[in-house]
């Protein structure tokens, strides 16, 4: 069975299947912020959906970070390093890409193992 969280007509924020939660790309809530602050916002959204998925950041299996400009890599990493679970940093890729909204500096996609109830 597939469980979907926060479903819209276009996409779900999370789909859970066979013990794995697949997340949609999470984006900043305030486009006026700098890369560090936008990354903090995105990570906060990820925390929210991890909780809704009955899991946490220590169970992230993979993260893909999309940056509008690689010049923001250091500031994104600063926010990431403050947030990531100690001794549980997941595999991660960082890619420069043109994002759907030109004011977004970062978008992050993850997969995570869920906690079985």
Swiss-Prot record:
Superkingdom of the source species: Bacteria
Alphabetized SUPFAM superfamilies for the sequence: YjgF-like
Pfam families: Ribonuc_L-PSP
Matches recorded under InterPro entries: RidA_CS (IPR019897), RutC-like_sf (IPR035959), YjgF/YER057c/UK114 (IPR006175), YoaB-like (IPR035709)
Protein family membership: Belongs to the RutC family.
The protein, known as: RutC family protein HD_0322
